[in-house]
Regions:
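Active-site beta-to-alpha loop of glycosyltransferases that engages the nucleotide-sugar donor
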Residues: 11-25, 43
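Acceptor/aglycone-binding surface of glycosyltransferases and processive sugar-polymer synthases
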Residues: 68-82, 87-90, 96-128
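Cell-envelope/extracellular polymer assembly enzymes that use nucleotide-activated donors
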Residues: 6-8, 36
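Residue-level preference for short helical/loop micro-motifs built around acidic side chains
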Residues: 18-22, 46, 50, 74
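Conserved donor nucleotide-binding strand/loop of the catalytic core
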Residues: 35, 49-82
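Short, acidic, metal-binding catalytic loop of nucleotide-sugar glycosyltransferases
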Residues: 25-34
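A conserved acidic beta->alpha catalytic loop
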Residues: 41-49, 95
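Structural signature of the Rossmann-like NAD(P)-dependent dehydrogenase/reductase core
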Residues: 8, 41-44, 66
Length: 128
């Protein structure tokens, strides 16, 4: 029987070909639970897709989800509609620095928190 994902990581992309490889390498080498990465994209010609396919050709953790419309919000909605995991985390394609927060967020989920919203932009926000 196939084990269910504990975590789906949604990454909305739009021309992120310069940053996505580093971001994915960091996630793939850091996250410790059973997870999938859902790449939510607007259009088939987005250079991000080719870069991912060229650098991670046989990685079964990476799933491509085409946006039903266009734009960031619709990409997230498309991603949420495609999730199957217990927990969902939104991660930015150009954030190759804060990948360690993924495990911390998942730990908080396991502790019983239903919404975890880390942000480096919220006044008084901090890494836990």
């Amino acid at each position: 029987m196939k084990e269910k994902n504990q975590l789906d990581i949604l990454i909305p992309v739009f021309n992120e070909d310069e940053t996505i490889v580093k971001t994915l390498k960091n996630i793939l080498s850091t996250v410790s639970c059973n997870y999938k990465i859902l790449i939510c994209y607007d259009y088939d010609e987005d250079p991000t897709l080719k870069i991912i396919k060229d650098n991670f050709p046989y990685n079964l953790k990476i799933i491509f989800v085409k946006n039903f419309s266009y734009g960031f919000n619709n990409a997230l909605i498309s991603g949420f509609k495609s999730t199957t995991a217990e927990a969902v985390l939104i991660f930015m394609a150009d954030d190759h620095i804060n990948h360690d927060v993924i495990n911390l967020c998942y730990e908080k989920f396991i502790e019983g928190y239903q919404v975890i919203c880390p942000s480096r932009f919220i006044k008084g926000g901090k890494m836990i």
